[in-house]
Amino acid sequence: GRELFFISRWPSPDLRQGRLSVREATVKLKGAEIICECLLAEGVEVIFGHPGGAVLPLYDALYKYSQLRHILVRHEQCAAHAADGYARASRQVGVCLATSGPGATNLVTGIACAMMDSVPIVAITGNVPTTAIGRDAFQETDITGITMPITKHNYLVTRVEDLARVLKEAFHIARTGRPGPVLVDIPKDIFLKETWFEYPETVNLPGYKPTLHGNARQIRAAAELIAQAQRPVILAGHGVLISGAEAELREFAEKTDIPVICTLLGLGAFPESHELSLAMPGMHGAAYSNLAIHESDLIIAIGMRFDDRITGKVEAFAPKAKVIHIDIDPAEIGKNVKATVPIVGDAKLVLRELIKAVQPGNHRDWLAQIWEWRRKMPLTVIRETDKLLPQYVIRKLYEITGGDAIVVTDVGQHQMWAAQHWWYDKPNSFISS
């Protein structure tokens, strides 16, 4: 039952292989080494970055940690986008690294993208030494101030003793609740200072307690609205995929016999080959899906924010419909469309509670009407021509692969074609922004 404490100035072979455990050893390490140990403790395998003077001590430490694979990018913006894409594809926290000043500011677009799409990344930036902060030193920027509106949280670490706690909190904040980017800014001298290292097993954030389970009274109220509805639709967003609630969404839709419309980032949350699946809504979506929303008397919105590309003029959006809005972020509920029954909670857990609360439904008449609209107003018709149309190419790629592929797009018209002409039956098979 006696604890073993190992004291060393440099990482042992066991540390380099990532086998140090807070239960096994407490050691004295430099700040840069502490960062590497924290990354290993969080299960990080890949880092995207670009070196610079303020982060050279961290690069020196990375050389000794072979389990951390560093991917060199040409520009720091690429590092942020790569971390974003890695997080979307792997469902792990993406990590990017940049130096001070222009290196840090080059991350901004990628961080903002991750913030908008609720993608968990941890951005680590170097800064000028602590004694030079606020003195307009060479390549000094207030990156914490700059990124305050586009991060879920950010830190400026001024004591090496705080590094382990800050990184533990950063990863916890990035991946829990509504995921998002967290930036950790570290002055150069903090990388070089030494302290005793012990990675905390828990976090202590009294002001940060995401609500996971829906309020029981609101669940009952939602079940009552669902029982009364004659023309309901489900709007499933990115939050369903983030929560891993695809199975619950399918069970809920099949039990209630309610059609499902997935948003752009929600594609794959519900199989498009399913009879209850309708095409993407909004200005680039299907007319019959938009008509179903417009004529509905109940919208069950799950993990989506009622983006302007879906609603158009908010005052005219679904004028006959009551709204059940389920989201883990309370700030989203009522922000764009007023909710009749707001439910704050994790999509997976709330859907489980709703499945128990609702009775089996039958909406065949309503579905027949929607299917008739779909027959008259299909999403698109690819006409035969002697020219090669991009829509035709995308559809042929889908047929050749049988849909068993991950589709990654930039933003633009090709993105819309990829959303329209590929059927996404599996979660996380469409990566876009």
Question: What do the PLM-derived regions correspond to, one by one?
Answer:
Residues 56-130, 234, 288-307, 416-433:
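Thiamine diphosphate
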Residues 14-21:
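Short Gly/Ser/Thr- and charged-rich N-terminal loops/segments
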Residues 22-23, 188-217, 221, 364-366, ...:
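Aromatic-enriched
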Residues 88, 238-324, 420-433:
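Glycine-rich, anion-gripping cofactor-binding loops and their flanking helix/strand elements
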Residues 45-46, 88-99, 104-125, 148-201, ...:
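Structural signature of the thiamine diphosphate
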Residues 32-35, 40-44, 50-53, 58-62, ...:
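Active-site diphosphate/adenylate-binding microenvironment
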